[in-house]
Amino acid sequence: MSKKNARWRKLDNAAKLYSAASNKKDTRVFRFYCELKEEVDSDVLQEALNQTIETFPTFLMVLRKGLFWHYLEPCNLRPIVKEEYKEPCSRLYIRDKKTLLFEVTYYKKRINFEVFHVLTDGTGATEFLKELIKNYLYLAHKEEGLEQVALLPEDMTVQDQEDDSFLKYYSKDQKRPKKRKLNTFQIRRKKKDGNHLHVHESVVSVQAVLKRSRELGVSMTIFLTALFMMAINEEMSKMQKKKPVVLMVPVNLRKFFPSTSMLNFFNWIEPGYNFTTQDQSFEAVLKYTKEFFETELTKEKMSAHISELLALELHPILRLAPLELKNLCIQAGAKYSEKNTTAIFSNMSAVKMPESYVPYIERFGVYTNTPKLELCLCSFQDKLSFAFTSRYDTVNIERNFYRLLKEQGITSEKVKPEFPKAGKPSELEMKVYKIYSFLCIAIVAAMLVTDLNFHPRIRWTLFTAGGVVTMWIASSIGFFKRYNLLKNAFRPMVSTSISGSSFRAL
């Protein structure tokens, strides 16, 4: 592969939306991981990552703010392998902070690759992780005779990797008929645990799903899309069923337009079904879904959608709008578009590795941070990994989904969640901290009011207020580092008491 240093570059169409719409809760980060059959060696993984970055220099970028758009700039930062230490799919991009937009971590037998969607899409992430796993296994087992193999074309260049395929296939003349957006059913459940992301995974047999799909005369994606809509329908009341269930289903555009780009290059379709006005049987939902996919998944319609998205971005007046104004408009548009879909279903398809590397790998998996309920899946060999992610206090829909699968003759096996304890305070700890903060503010306010009204000769009120503020700041810093309020409040309280005693002695 030709290795020419990457240069600064413009964001692709999807990346421009992600850079503006991401926030602390909706991080636009997704995780692709590989579970091995052996414990991960961090030193070997670091060496493998260093080699992988040589293959994909386009990933060594930081996000910068320009006058009109964000852009990516090469940097001298290098990724450091860490043991997993935080909630999956946590924020990677922090505004005005120079950080890489991806991270490689490990936990026991699992290697995680997390990436901000600005940098790449699912296909790009798959290629990066495959290269990383290949390099790791080669370094770990080359003494056993494992051979080094190339996964990418030898003649692939950096320019190929950073090619903006959206622009490449944009046509001014291509137009898509406008569709009226539906007022869709929205899942509304009380969120728990401080709005943390919840991940629930299961594994099924690829052959079992393919066998049943073929018996029904549909693809695996169509079969599972219909089941997902049925599972959601079972949780809807009679009133709620007046609104359609609409899924967002991402589509890899490389299947329609040749591209070796590592940038975002995907589209989506939105199959929707109204369970009040349409037949509620599975056969009817499956028939509708099949017809919808056949109608929408055409090169002409994908091309028209690309042109529609690019036409807005390239509008001469909108291009001149300052970045901050664009960000506000994109954020408002993203918030509005959330109402157009009920949930998200993303099929990352099969991950293939060289035959000699297969015995060392258990499975691959993928999931993403999302404000909605999302089902992601990918397969390796005969293991199809499902991952439901949400921030809702319910697992009923996924329970329904797996029950419906079982009714189709497909059994699933739950994956026991294995995550290190997240470095975040619990809901109870946050409540205690908020009460503590309120009391500190109340004391400071009382001291200031007392000082203003009584004007004591010795300004003990101001010293007390200052001591409380100091104690609160020190306690807060310690709390968000260690999440133990009593332990972190003790030292400031002692310091404040000593200071107060010294002052009185004077």
Question: Which residues are covered by each model-predicted region?
Answer:
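Acyl activation and transfer enzymes in specialized metabolism, enriched
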Residues: K37-E54, E114-K130, V199-K238, F386-F388, ...
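Non-catalytic, low-complexity flexible loops and terminal extensions
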Residues: S2-N13, R110, L119-E127, E131-K211, ...
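Hydrophobic alpha-helical transmembrane segments
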Residues: P456-G467
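Acyl-thioester-dependent acyl-group transfer interface
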Residues: M1-L67, N76-E103, E234-G423
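Low-acidity, Ser/Thr- and Arg-rich intrinsically disordered low-complexity segments
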Residues: R482, K487-R504
